[in-house]
Amino acid sequence: MRADEIEGVLAFLRAAERLKTVMRSGWTSEGQQESVAEHTWRLCLMAMLLYGHTPGIDLARLLKMCLIHDLGEAIGGDVPAPAQKAGVSKADQERSDLVQLIAPLPPALRREIIELWDEYEAAGSPEAKVAKGLDKLETILQHNQGKNPANFDYAFNLDYGQRYTAADPIMSALRERLDAETARRARDEAIPRRRADLD
């Protein structure tokens, strides 16, 4: 790698550092808002632990997709699924932001990242389908585990990302357990609110 390419990689890494402070809609079990970087870390951990249960998956490709799937949010931030507006393409904006973010990288790395992101977004390969499904499951897991605000909408998660988790047996099994946790959490959180309304 040439000196100018090394500088480009460093410039990209400095810009990508923003993901450590871009907040998501989930909260940690300690009551702190989760960052995009934290979500990506656990998504990669899930991919590493579960990829062997889906035949024909290339782990390196799967992990790369998991690492880059939210990179564009370093520029545009995270837009939670319930807050997305009809007629506005989150994917188009994220891709545009991603292109801007990776501009300092050498051409071959830019091409690889864009190709991986496009494949992920289209769910166009076994790896992309697993990455998409695990992305949804990690989000639900965090919502179930976190200390969320009092008005948190757990019911939304019962339908969230179903099409990405239904076809794979291991993801379906995880989904079944997470949905049961979600329903229990929604019920348990609603009881104190109803009591407060009666007071």
Question: What is each model feature region?
Answer:
Residues M1-D199:
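Alpha-helical, largely C-terminal catalytic domains
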